[in-house]
């Protein structure tokens, strides 16, 4: 007899199953709510994502928008989603979160699929975190692998999905994600790995970047090409699987070679000393964290055209100085004659780690012939140096002595040596390589707009990487004869004129404080007797400057010089001030000469034009006091304080004084007289005549023993100052013997006109291209009268013994020339002749 089946069994089973399911659901919901309330107090406010400011580096630009530098630990180029290629977005979604548009921040299906994949393969081949979860982790959580961190991540992701749209989440994610080499976001990664903007990436490059979030340190194409290639191919396969690309596109992208190297920020203008000024200014104003992470764009006053001109002129001139003093030998010896030469692989690897200074490259000598040498140049491989590009290399003995001219390259080069070379270029293409060396001396160059004080170009030294000390702003050096225009301006203010005669004769004065005689001398030590003030400044007559100082008075002169921004403690309280014993920076000299260039106004140098935040809003805008070109309330009043609210710069010398001083500075370049009648003469700045412009002027400066060489001058809208010297103040610039192997060789003692002026001339030749000649108008209250060249007195003669001269009205001579020349020598108020 069969047992009776329990007809209620299926019903009971279903009931039990439902009860069990309900219990599981209740437990699940309870667990979820329990987890939620447990972590609720620790959950961040995701609403902050609406106003999130991604950590973005500070960028420094020229006034015309050329990138100079980027500062900040994290490289990031924030982009709008619409600025990103569609293929890039699809590649990331296909690889990181294929169900991105179907879930609400947390994807149970994705987790289940990943779990089965782990069980099947024994390894975590698929990620379980959605893009939103990754965003939550990147913004609010650490990377530690703990259950509670994962729980928080899920809840935060759900909150994010409620707050932001899918497009907004994607944009944040693609700008936030770390992709290796300090690059955060796809914009920075495209620049770092390929030197491109994201819109210019190929499909293969897009896939490579999209594959980086999984392991940015080990799968990037710089660290491992093989791993990066494999990961790229996985991304391409996922894009094909999701039907984002065709099979033909897939095959073409897989066939792309992986060609990647590190690209820093794409610097468009070499101005590192200016960049450092901007960086320090930003840190002082906003604090270090805000300066480096808030994405500020700093626009400096630098003009890219003028900065490039200054870079070229300053470095060319410094290397020309260095080369005429001789070759100091190779940087080091890599292998000796009895040793095997290095392989190309060794050379390439070694030289890749050696610094490059501007356009100066390290190289290894491979072989040497009588009139040529074969070298391996960093980044350029095998190159040849011709004889004409190295025959300058006579031996350096000391700063004053050089060896004989070389007759063969074997005299100074040998295989195995590491040397330095520079390219010769034509129309941007390299045509040859020239032997050079890292200079021992250094240089500075400053260009300033005299209308408002904007520093439009600045070179602080030979190379910022080589030495970060900024000689343009920090190096306080004796200025030599550069100080004389300011002393002569004081003399004009005292009542002297351009025609005043000062005795150009030796001085022999006992100095009780030193217990010895003081004998200032001209350089060269030649004397012309009674000489007009114009000639005295133009030819830089030392003894005349001392006598002019005596007439004005030492204390009065020092006080007068403070009008130009010089400090009293920078100006010695002795007559040596007339010879340039005062010490100033190149920027101070540019500021001082700006007063002459702008008709008498004192402008403050500044470097930062404006600061913009990442949204384009202006955080700071410079408001410099500018020169007044119309009727202003600004009056000259012995440098008295003027209205601080005025937009105009204070007037510190009269327009007439500035004009007459410019006349003397003009003569420093163009001289005077008539060469055809033997009355012609040159000033110490005669080399600037090469510019063929009559709207320029300046003054040389050479200190005792030629330790410092200066040229300070102006042109329309520009004041330029060039300095050359050694950082070691005890070392002088020396002298050179003639070298017929150097084009335009200059021999003899180094000086302002020989050592610094060529940099000024080259700069102005580039800066003034397409700038028409602009003569300043003669001011009111200036008269022009005919005088005798020798005496400075009035004359009726129309021959070469006469000339026209400018005077401030009321100071022109009233007396006509006589035969008694000595009677016209300027005398002091006490009636004593200035001898």
Regions found by a protein language model. Name each.
Residues 300, 304-307, 311-313, 342-346, ...:
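A penicillin-recognizing enzyme superfamily signal
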Residues 77-82, 399-410, 438-443, 466-486, ...:
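Short active-site loop at a secondary-structure junction
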Residues 101-111, 184-187, 246-250, 469, ...:
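Short, well-structured active-site flanking segments
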Residues 1-61, 99, 118-119:
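N-terminal type II signal-anchor transmembrane helix
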Residues 120-145, 199, 266-267, 451, ...:
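Conserved catalytic neighborhood of penicillin-recognizing serine enzymes
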Residues 517-521, 553-591:
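Mid-domain, small-residue-enriched loop/turn segments at the edges of structured enzyme/sensor domains
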Residues 32, 123-379, 562-563, 567-568, ...:
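Non-catalytic, structured segments within soluble enzyme domains
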Residues 92-93, 239, 310, 370, ...:
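Active-site SXXK
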